Amino acid sequence: MFATACPSNREAIYGMLATSPVKPQGVTASNGSAFMVAPGILITAAHCVHIETNPNKSVHNKFELIRAPDIGQKMESATLIAFDKKKDLALLKIDEPRSTACLKLLKATVPPGTPCGSLGFPLASVSFNPSGIGFNLIERFQGANISAFVVATDPIGNKISFYETDSLMYGGSSGCPGFIASGEVFGMNNRSAIEGTGDNPKESGAGNRTRLAISMWVTSMDIVAFASTNGVVL
């Protein structure tokens, strides 16, 4: 079902490496996926642009991106335009991108039961060595179904909305776009919920099987609104 959408969408999907110096002579890094939504403009998860992926810490000061078809080439430098910790969205800009291929964002909700897919760089790893930083990426597809479009109220009374899908994503999937069979994007993955049946999370076996495993997605409508607020019309 997604064999047609994946080759097209991968043209606009990137691995992101964010770094900052730490005393005395070290470097700290975060990583995630990102996708281009307008020429040179990319969306990723806000927590991925913060040190230790912690929204309560400072943002990194260096951002580099590599497009899926360009793996093995030199990474492209980007600047952070804006971020919204509540929505968990961030905008990055590449001044002179190698490619301007973009993904199309849906501007209406997708009904529950719709098959969906995701493409990006979960399970990526960063290594530090004398010659520099190694960023190890494998492009991965994941499939699921949309289980709910949730409208809720946060602890301070603000309305929030997000999608739920019915399968757990690989670790490190933040920033991956979620799309339907046409390739159009319904959201961006930013978190998952896992709940087991056992009392002791260290125990395994029938008494501690996972009984809840869902993934949550920032909606495409929120992405469009966030981009518009920051001068990017999608």
Model-derived features with residue positions:
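Terminal peptide-recognition signature
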Residues: 16, 34, 40, 44, ...
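Short, small/polar residue-rich loop motifs at catalytic or cofactor-binding pockets
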Residues: 28-31, 170-174
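Catalytic-histidine neighborhood of serine endopeptidases
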Residues: 29-31, 37-85, 121
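Flexible, gly/ser-rich surface segments that form the specificity/activation loops bordering the active-site cleft
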Residues: 101-163, 168-173, 189-201
